[in-house]
From Swiss-Prot:
Organism in which the protein naturally occurs: Homo sapiens
Topological category with respect to the lipid bilayer: Peripheral membrane protein
Subcellular location: Mitochondrion inner membrane
Matching PANTHER family: ATP SYNTHASE MITOCHONDRIAL F1 COMPLEX ASSEMBLY FACTOR 2, ATP SYNTHASE MITOCHONDRIAL F1 COMPLEX ASSEMBLY FACTOR 2/ATP12 PROTEIN, MITOCHONDRIAL PRECURSOR
Higher taxonomy: Eukaryota, Metazoa, Chordata, Craniata, Vertebrata
Recorded disease: Mitochondrial complex V deficiency, nuclear type 1: A mitochondrial disorder with heterogeneous clinical manifestations including dysmorphic features, psychomotor retardation, hypotonia, growth retardation, cardiomyopathy, enlarged liver, hypoplastic kidneys and elevated lactate levels in urine, plasma and cerebrospinal fluid.
Similarity remark: Belongs to the ATP12 family.
Residue range covered by the transit peptide: 1-40
Subunit structure of this chain's protein: Interacts with ATP5F1B; involved in the assembly of the F1 component of the mitochondrial ATP synthase (ATPase). Interacts with FMC1.
Protein name: ATP synthase mitochondrial F1 complex assembly factor 2
Coiled-coil blocks: none
Free-text tissue specificity from the UniProt record: Widely expressed.
Listed GO CC annotations: cytosol; mitochondrial inner membrane; mitochondrion; nuclear speck
GO biological processes: mitochondrial proton-transporting ATP synthase complex assembly; proton-transporting ATP synthase complex assembly
Amino acid sequence: MWRSCLRLRDGGRRLLNRPAGGPSASMSPGPTIPSPARAYAPPTERKRFYQNVSITQGEGGFEINLDHRKLKTPQAKLFTVPSEALAIAVATEWDSQQDTIKYYTMHLTTLCNTSLDNPTQRNKDQLIRAAVKFLDTDTICYRVEEPETLVELQRNEWDPIIEWAEKRYGVEISSSTSIMGPSIPAKTREVLVSHLASYNTWALQGIEFVAAQLKSMVLTLGLIDLRLTVEQAVLLSRLEEEYQIQKWGNIEWAHDYELQELRARTAAGTLFIHLCSESTTVKHKLLKE
């Protein structure tokens, strides 16, 4: 994960001093976050209207320039991000678009727009509680009673992650075969609320986004703590689907597309969390020293 961040930083520095140019163009808002915090309905595609992408540092952070125009959010706010690494990653999204801009592929831009505009008007406490609420319907806490092969598969693949989370955070996370789901102790919620409070609102937007993709807070925590890779987390979130596919077969192209899309969204969300937490974490460590 961090090697990927460094490659983005090093490979993208050319964007910082790239000369602006090309025909003038009016700015178009980028994509925005899907459920659970959907608020915008941008076009899915449009013809590319810029030639060059560059980054400049302003008073409020790092800005993205498309030719000589500054990128803005759907609510017409200046698109400004808190770190150079995140700016490079977003600029790379825009620079990698070909003749057609495919907004639905630009997940980092989506998350930045949501963080800047806050279309649902939620504060930090509300973001934290929205993320913790995923425990109530956490994918890996819902178990089947049959067939035995799937029961065993869920036990072998999901139990180690639950055990890791319980040990890592000092909490209790149970599983259940009931349609009502497991009963999550109040202490578990309190501990996770306290833990998530250490993140800034940008990172919390990313955490909720990843949890929504995986339908699991436990798997999201595993990703953040580098206990799981993106590929592992996605496969664990789709354990029953993959079991059924292996048993009954699938429409190959549809399955492959869905899997790749889920990986892309999850990877982007996880990268967003780390890039938004980086400066805060470093500052916290320096203060402690």
